[in-house]
Amino acid sequence: NHNFTTASPNLYSDMVGESVAFKKVTNIIERVKDNKATIIITGESGTGKELVARAIHYSGKFSREPFIAVNCGAIPENLQEAELFGYIKGAFTGANENRNGFFQAAKGGTLFLDEIGTASLAVQTKLLRALQEKEITRVGSQKVEKVDIRIIAATNANLKDEIKNGSFREDLYYRLTVVEINVPPLRERKSDISILADKFIRKYGIEFKDRLLRIAPEALQILERYNWPGNIRELENIIQRAVIMSDGIIKVKDLPEALKYQIDFPDNGLRPLYEMEKEYIQRVLVHTKGNKTKAAQILQIDRKTLREKLK
């Protein structure tokens, strides 16, 4: 487990950033870290939802208590109840002894339920009771056990859509969303890319090269221009690869080809396709320093088509 510090309000060990979007998240963390209000963390895959949950736990007054992280999507539906709430001997075939679940393991601390949208309806019913009555029952038992834990759930799905299609309980949704923290995608916190890149360069430089590396300004510009569909997880993977491939300074050549030629357009309203296409071609030509053969290769068209599109 990481030991999160509160050296500054926007720094929680593995969480770094200075953008307005990032500070919105850390401001909420500051408000909720010392109470046991139920929290739901939303955001795209790879944005760092578990890091936010850990920051809440380890920066608050319950930091000495257990932090138990569970990915609901990784547990087969028929085992979810037993894994979460425990079971008694003889509850089902193979239940040869009484066994605690994640709820018992998290006693006094925090239970983090990732991918909550994948929880079975049976689990959702028991979870609702745990939140309302602060009590659970093990699989196969009638005995009620009191639970004193903070529940933090996370999802990258739209739970309101899940409610509409009948796969998620509406009453549970409102119980979980006492406090909602939306973790922004990396494309909405571009000013944090250099800080995050530096963190990962330090981490993997020491791990793989036993020394500190640095990144060339033009390579950093490419990282800052890219749209990051895989968010922080994708950035970390790319930096890890670049550290392995580099000779001390991470250069453009150490980055994947896909990053070098992906160009973002500002959303200035709708324009004819030929205008956007021409603008894109011109940007690629700037990138290739006017080399039309190279530009045609990147665009996956022949030179004749390129000439026609530039007319």
Where are these regions (language model features)?
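Conserved RecA-like P-loop NTPase ATPase core
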Residues: 25, 47, 70, 84, ...
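Conserved post-Walker A coupling segment in P-loop NTPases
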Residues: 14, 27-93, 100, 104-120, ...
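N-terminal accessory segments that target, anchor, or regulate ATP-driven/P-loop NTPase machines
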Residues: 1-10, 298, 308-310
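Bacterial C-terminal helix-turn-helix
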Residues: 237, 266-311
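Short gly/ser/thr-rich secondary-structure transition/capping motifs
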Residues: 90-97, 133-138
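Base-recognition residues in the alpha-helical recognition helix of bacterial helix-turn-helix
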Residues: 125, 129, 137, 302, ...
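Nucleotide-binding/hydrolysis machinery
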Residues: 8, 12, 18-21, 34, ...
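AAA+/SF3 P-loop NTPase mechanochemical coupling elements
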Residues: 98-108, 112, 120-126, 137-156, ...
